[in-house]
Amino acid sequence: MRVMSQLAMVMNLDKCIGCHTCSVTCKQAWTNRSGVEYVWFNNVETRPGQGYPRTYQDQERWQGGWTLNRRGRLTLKAGGRLKKLLSIFSNPVMPSIYDYYEPWTYDYETLTNAPAQQHTPVARPKSLLTGRDMKVTWSANWDDDLGGGPTLTQDDPVLKKLSEKITLDFEQTFMFYLPRICEHCLNPACAASCPSGAIYKRAEDGIVLVDQDRCRGWRMCVTGCPYKKVYFNHRTGKAEKCTFCFPRIEVGLPTICAETCVGRLRYIGVVLYDADKVLEAASVTDDKDLLRAQRAVFLDPDDPAVQRAAEEAGIPRDWVESAQRSPVWALINRFEVALPLHPEYRTLPMVWYIPPLSPVVDSLTDTGHDGENAGNLFGAIDTLRIPVTYLAELFTAGDPGPVRDVLARLAAMRSFMRDVNLGREPDVSIPDAVGMTTDDIEDMHRLLAIAKYDERYVIPTAHAEGRDPQQLAHSLEELATECSLDYEDGPGMTPSGPFGESSGGAVPIALENFQMLKQRQRSDTFVDPSDGRERVNLLNWDGKGQGGLFLPAPDAPDDDAGGGPGMPARGEPDGIRP
């Protein structure tokens, strides 16, 4: 047994109201920059729907995740090393910008500077990629709230699997919201797909990150990720992904999406797992056994043997104590109401979901029945095939059994706690019917309904033991004296050049530990004519560092040459000379 720790998240889908607050705050914190306008580390999808990017769940098309070969061994669905080598310069299986959407802005100057006229001026949408006028045809949440109608809904890859069994009646359909971030998998296909080894999983907390120094822009990770949560920055030529807000996590704060969530539906905590069982769990033959296999990988933090093994593995004591109080462990293994998203991808995802009971309750109340009665709820779960079957395709590789069990437990809690809150004698047979005790029902109700901040987010702080003293001192100095957003091309900063700019100052570690741009061009100063020995990456040069092989413009003096032909001179915005 090799014990490791993993920070994981559980989302209660019944509490998501689709307000997109998490998406907006994540966007402002992480991807409010040039080159990642189309990137949403966190997005909220309406189900049924196509998702973002469009039809990303269709792995027959996108070739994401893992599969078993003829010998029963785990292999990437997109192919092994030889296939990747043959297609390394032209990845044939990758979403285009049209599968995401072409980002745009508006020509607001048309409104602010328009003279008096008879007709109302119009601010036309302009592409952020080309700068030309464009027609808006899609976005990250174009089909929000089933806005596209049955024309768009019928393209849902999950719904297509059910087309032979169920015909979607749009007027009587159900819907729910599905917030998505990077799954930070135990067996990440994106890391295995990267030819440069730029994607890595941190040993101390399991967060999957991208080393910007090692990334060469092959984009195999985009194909390898079945959830399509790795994005390509077209200006820097690097891959970017959700970081699980690790600068906040390291000081015991939740992710920005969890912090700002209006519905308080997210739970974050530590899970201990046996690293030696990961490959075995991901390699089970039947897709429907993957849920059980992944749950078996997780270790009971109250087990003395697990505690001793964790201590021998160097896991701090406070992390073990946090695992004992973890809401994630309770929802996944104690109450067994949380399920992984698409376990059939075999990545062993670590962002789990509590399926929504609301479609069942709504169907009962719409027909005049008591939506809180245990008997009515149990019967509706068995008879309403559409919600259960659809949820099974999302969370249990098509097996409706675990979904029924989860919905039954949620229904039992709903009915039992109604009697308690109304002062009536609770029916003790309700918990027994779903294999739970009265204490389990009450504890689950507290966690799902009235848990406070410190109960929903049990996050131990990072430990500085073993760090290089000089590095630790610098990080403390940075924390006290620097702004975490004060770096070139950071959120809110103005970009300074074309593809490959922002090679100057290093990004503070308080914001990213990608070692981003550490020695991208071996210099962080403007051109110094007296220094002729500095190396420079000519493919990514932006006028900072030594000029290399580029000669200064004929009409520019040496001390004012900023970047060679076509590049802006120092101190002149956008390269416009007077």
What are these regions (language model features)?
Residues 1-578:
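Non-ligating segments of multi-cofactor redox enzymes
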